[in-house]
C-alpha cells in the first residue's frame, strides 16, 4: 500500500480508558513497522443539561449535569499489510468508539 494513510479517530467518555486504547493502537502500529503521528488530543465536547429538581413549582431550584466526550486522533503513515491485519484483530474496550478512514 504505497503512500497511503490510515486515520483513526477515537471517542470516549472516560479519558483513562481512551488513553489506554490509544496506547494499544500505537504499540501495535509501531510493532508492525508503520510510522505513527499522534495521538493528537482533539477538543473535548461538553454537553450540559439543566433539570428542575422538583416536580412542581420551584423554578429556581435546578440541577445541572454534564457529559464530557474526549477525542483523540491517530495517523498511521505508510501502513503495511501486517499493520492492517493487526489493527483488525485488535480488541479494544467497550466504552471506546473507533472511526477508521483509509
UniProtKB/Swiss-Prot annotation:
Which Gene Ontology cellular component terms are annotated? Answer: ribonucleoprotein complex; ribosome
Q: Which domain of life is it from?
A: Bacteria
Q: Which InterPro entries match?
A: Ribosomal_uS10 (IPR001848), Ribosomal_uS10_CS (IPR018268), Ribosomal_uS10_dom (IPR027486), Ribosomal_uS10_dom_sf (IPR036838)
Q: Output one GO BP term.
A: translation
Keywords from the named record: Ribonucleoprotein, Ribosomal protein
- GO MF, one annotated term: structural constituent of ribosome
Q: Provide the function of this protein.
A: Involved in the binding of tRNA to the ribosomes.
Q: What is this protein called?
A: Small ribosomal subunit protein uS10
Please report the organism this UniProt entry assigns to the protein.
Citrifermentans bemidjiense (strain ATCC BAA-1014 / DSM 16622 / JCM 12645 / Bem)
Amino acid at each position: 500500500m504505497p503512500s497511503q494513510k490510515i486515520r483513526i479517530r477515537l471517542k470516549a467518555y472516560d479519558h483513562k480508558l481512551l488513553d489506554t486504547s490509544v496506547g494499544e493502537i500505537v504499540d501495535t502500529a509501531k510493532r508492525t513497522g508503520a510510522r505513527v503521528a499522534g495521538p493528537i488530543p482533539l477538543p473535548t465536547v461538553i454537553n450540559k443539561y439543566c433539570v428542575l429538581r422538583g416536580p412542581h413549582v420551584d423554578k429556581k431550584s435546578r440541577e445541572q449535569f454534564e457529559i464530557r466526550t474526549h477525542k483523540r486522533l491517530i495517523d498511521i503513515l505508510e501502513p503495511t499489510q501486517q499493520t492492517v491485519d493487526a489493527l483488525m484483530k485488535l480488541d479494544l474496550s467497550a466504552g471506546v468508539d473507533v472511526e477508521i478512514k483509509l
